[in-house]
Every structure is written in structure tokens, then in C-alpha cells.
């Protein structure tokens, strides 16, 4: 589960490498985010010449989580790292490529562009 102050790897080519969670969106008093949830982050590490710079406040969607997510059939999916994709206000990704697998739960939350760009959907 992703909470405030959690650091995540960025799984796109927007220019950010690592972000720190500021807030979990979706209701007052919400503490944790899971796969498919939108969070507000600040960029902690960035590559030179990228779209986003260090210190920028951005929105991102969680695409991989160490704690995993429970599916309707009772199975769980877990990943080796916490990762996110930086998005615009209309839920489209700011980068043009997605690195690594993403969870199928993104399709349920209408992040179809991220699902189509991903090399593998688990």
C-alpha cells in the first residue's frame, strides 16, 4: 500500500526517475493507495532534458505495488517494487513509453492509454 512519504519508481519516460507521495486522492481522510489509484507526488530524481523537473508537483497513477491487490476471483497480484506513471488531468500519460508490466486493474479504472502502451499486462 502506498501512503504519504512513500517513494516510488517512475515507469515511464517523462523524465522523472523517483517520486515521493504527498497525498492520496479520493475522499477525505484516505490514508493508502493501491494499484489503479491516483496520488499527488513531487519529483525527487529526474533525468536531464526530461518533461518534468526535480521539485515539480505531479499526479501519478500506481501501476505496481509490493503489497499487491486482491482480485475478484480471490487471487492476489504482487510486484517486486512500487511504481507509478505520471499522468495529466485527463488521465493520459505524460510520457510516450511505459516500462515494465502493469496490473489489469488499470483497465477497470479507465487508464486505457497506459494499458495499451505497456509491454505486458498481468
Curated annotation (Swiss-Prot):
The keyword Metal-binding does not apply. GO terms for molecular function: large ribosomal subunit rRNA binding; structural constituent of ribosome. InterPro entries: Ribosomal_uL14, Ribosomal_uL14_bac-type, Ribosomal_uL14_CS, Ribosomal_uL14_sf. It comes from the Bacteria. Keywords: Ribonucleoprotein, Ribosomal protein, RNA-binding, rRNA-binding. Pfam families: Ribosomal_L14. PROSITE patterns: RIBOSOMAL_L14. SMART domains: Ribosomal_L14. GO terms for cellular component: cytosolic large ribosomal subunit. One of its GO terms (biological process) is translation. Binds to 23S rRNA. Forms part of two intersubunit bridges in the 70S ribosome. Part of the 50S ribosomal subunit. Forms a cluster with proteins L3 and L19. In the 70S ribosome, L14 and L19 interact and together make contacts with the 16S rRNA in bridges B5 and B8. Belongs to the universal ribosomal protein uL14 family. This is Large ribosomal subunit protein uL14. It comes from Bacillus licheniformis (strain ATCC 14580 / DSM 13 / JCM 2505 / CCUG 7422 / NBRC 12200 / NCIMB 9375 / NCTC 10341 / NRRL NRS-1264 / Gibson 46). The gene is rplN.
Amino acid at each position: 500500500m502506498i501512503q504519504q512519504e512513500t517513494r516510488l519508481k517512475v515507469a515511464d519516460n517523462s523524465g522523472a526517475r523517483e517520486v515521493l507521495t504527498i497525498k492520496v486522492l479520493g475522499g477525505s481522510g484516505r490514508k493508502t493507495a493501491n494499484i489503479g489509484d491516483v496520488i499527488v507526488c513531487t519529483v525527487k530524481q529526474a533525468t536531464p532534458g526530461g518533461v518534468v523537473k526535480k521539485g515539480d508537483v505531479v499526479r501519478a497513477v500506481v501501476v505496481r505495488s509490493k503489497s499487491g491487490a486482491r482480485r475478484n476471483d480471490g487471487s492476489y497480484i504482487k510486484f517486486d517494487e512500487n511504481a507509478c506513471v505520471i499522468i495529466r488531468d485527463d488521465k493520459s500519460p505524460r510520457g510516450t513509453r511505459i516500462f515494465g508490466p502493469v496490473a489489469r486493474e488499470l483497465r477497470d479504472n479507465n487508464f486505457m492509454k497506459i494499458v495499451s502502451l505497456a509491454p505486458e499486462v498481468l
